[in-house]
Amino acid sequence: MGAVSRDDYIALCTELVEHDRRYYVLNQPTISDYSYDVKMRELQEIEVQHPEWKVSWSPTMYLGDRPSGQFPVVPHSSPMLSIANVYSLQELEEFFSRTEKLLGYSPGYSLELKIDGIAVAIRYEKRLFAQALSRGNGVKGEDITANVSTIRSLPMRLPQEAPEDLEVRGEVFLSYEAFEELNACQREQGKLEFANPRNAAGGTLKLLSSKEAAKRKLDLSVYGLITDQKKRSHFENLQLCSQWGFFVAGMPKQCRSRQDVVERIREIEEMRAALPMAIDGVVIKVDNIAYQDRLGLTSKHYRWAIAYKYAPERAETILEDIVVQVGKTGILTPVAELAPVFLSGSRVSRASLYNQDEIEKKDIRIGDSVYVEKGGEVIPKIVGINLAKRSLESEPWKMPSLCPVCHEPVVKEKVSVRCVNPLCSGGMLEKICFFASKSALNIDHLGEKVVTKLFEVGLISSCSDIFALAEEDLKQVPGFKDRSIQNLLASIAGAKKVALDRLLTALSIPFVGSSGAIALADHFGTLDKVIEASLDELMSIEGIGPKVAASIVAFFSKHENREEIRRMQELGVQVLSKQSDKEAPLQGKVFVLTGTLQQMTRTQAEERIRCLGGKVSSSVSKSTYAVIAGSEAGGKLKKAQDLGLSIWNESELLRILDAKSVS
């Protein structure tokens, strides 16, 4: 690692916080586990060398799974930590040596599959299923009981030989078969497909409707048991779980020696492709429970366990073409069109090529037979070329000098090639899709396919056009029915009240992600102050370096960007100010939403309540301040009435929100 400045440190923190959010909250990771671990180790090394730089929000301080806000948060019975990863047999030997040095002798080990899913804790009371929690930050997790209860392989009642009260920990996942069924359903409904089974499982556990979750065929494999009556060994505990009706995947095995462990690792790697679910490695644990207790844990990991990660699965196929896409900030990205191949449980027909430099470095050519892998089972990429199969007539590929969409000249930057035409329809389509997406304004019923259709027929050509859509215009679009039109217009109306950080993210300011947008909103409070901010003022904000600050100033200095914001405001968009705890009128008050809202989505309502300091829970209790009852409200409304709680309709909620929240 070369010389590092504090700005470099802050930039790395910010990058990892964003990766944590994408992995744990959005279930949309963009880098491999290995790349993440390398960056995390670099961050830890910097903090050791420069402890005075360490910020309170450093990703080394938590596990990354921040609450989504949709479910109540509950403490774990004991820390639910992650397991450290190793990627080579040499690193595994270091784990063995470290463990044996701490104990003073060589313990036995158990070995099990590392399923690529979502970790959960499941509690039983009087042998009946009682509660399920996500891992969360390791100390507290979200109550996902309703969605976990839809897992058919999860026993609702345990046999008499099981202890009355116990907790199991396991991995929620989707089999390859269930994953393919789900994506087929997504395609039929015109929705985006999930990138991989883990993303699909994570998204399912976050659903607000357990009826929808039940349709997705989640599965659960148990990997741990917490009870006063547990056996002396971890392996025996897993056998007990299996006897009580839990699914324990992949033949856990006791290993007497290091060599036994290595042999088993190789056996599983050979059978990996034939397994019915995605795995990304194996977990090795000290088998004796008393030894586990002696070894203890760190702030992030168990000392008695390690995950050995396999190299990503690889396949060979033909590179049929290279197409160039224009992104939301105008960057041109080459994409490989591949002869379809099955890899890591899904059909792969495209792969990212990143940029011209990457293509030149690997000398990738159209017609090549290439090796493709999913980095950390996330995004397919080309990792090599079978030169023995290369045609003598193949030629090096070059990035076009004109934008493939608007045909204007492109500009070569340090690494990227960018179309700087503000009217380029290619970049604008991507920008509008992102603006409406879950990561930005989260406008229901306005997914990528709908945006593309509206763009192609000329109804929208900018983000602000979304708010000008009218019923009579939409009726002219083939395939749009009355109900879908009403749903879309209702979602757009709800999106007109938008939190400041959400809007800043949605504007696609170069180098400003969600973390930067939150920092700007926290510091300035209003949109006008952000727009008028100077370079020096921006650079005074922790996490905003010179490059990002210059990009923000440049963005808001452009007439077309200011005009776009002005038009949004003319069309009714109101930016919710970021209020301090002292000013927040709903500070500390807990709300529960039930039934269907008509004028905004539930997510939009929750966000507006939080902007005013309120909290949103999924369950009614004596601490609930008010229950917001929409149409078809069910059991939560009845419970609120029984407890004598305040019950508001949607109009009452909107009256409070509109009076208090608009800057």
From Swiss-Prot:
User: What are its E.C. numbers?
Assistant: 6.5.1.2
GO biological process annotation, one example: DNA repair
Q: Which cysteines are joined by disulfide bonds?
A: none
Annotated InterPro entries: BRCT_dom (IPR001357), BRCT_dom_sf (IPR036420), DisA/LigA_HHH (IPR041663), DNA_ligase (IPR001679), DNA_ligase_AS (IPR018239), DNA_ligase_CS (IPR033136), DNAligase_adenylation (IPR013839), DNAligase_N (IPR013840)
Q: What is this protein called?
A: DNA ligase
Q: Where is the BRCT domain?
A: 581-663
The yes or no answer to whether the keyword DNA damage is present is yes
Give binding positions for NAD(+). 33-37, 82-83, 112, 135, 171, 285, 309
What this protein is reported to do is described as: DNA ligase that catalyzes the formation of phosphodiester linkages between 5'-phosphoryl and 3'-hydroxyl groups in double-stranded DNA using NAD as a coenzyme and as the energy source for the reaction. It is essential for DNA replication and repair of damaged DNA.
Cofactor(s) the protein requires to work: Mg(2+); Mn(2+)
- Give residues annotated as binding Zn(2+): 403, 406, 419, 424
Keywords from the UniProt entry? DNA damage, DNA repair, DNA replication, Ligase, Magnesium, Manganese, Metal-binding, NAD, Zinc
State the family named in the UniProt similarity comment for this chain. Answer: Belongs to the NAD-dependent DNA ligase family. LigA subfamily.
GO CC annotation, single: cytosol
Q: Does the keyword Protease apply?
A: no
Q: Taxonomy-wise, where does this protein's organism fall, top ranks first?
A: Bacteria, Pseudomonadati, Chlamydiota, Chlamydiia, Chlamydiales
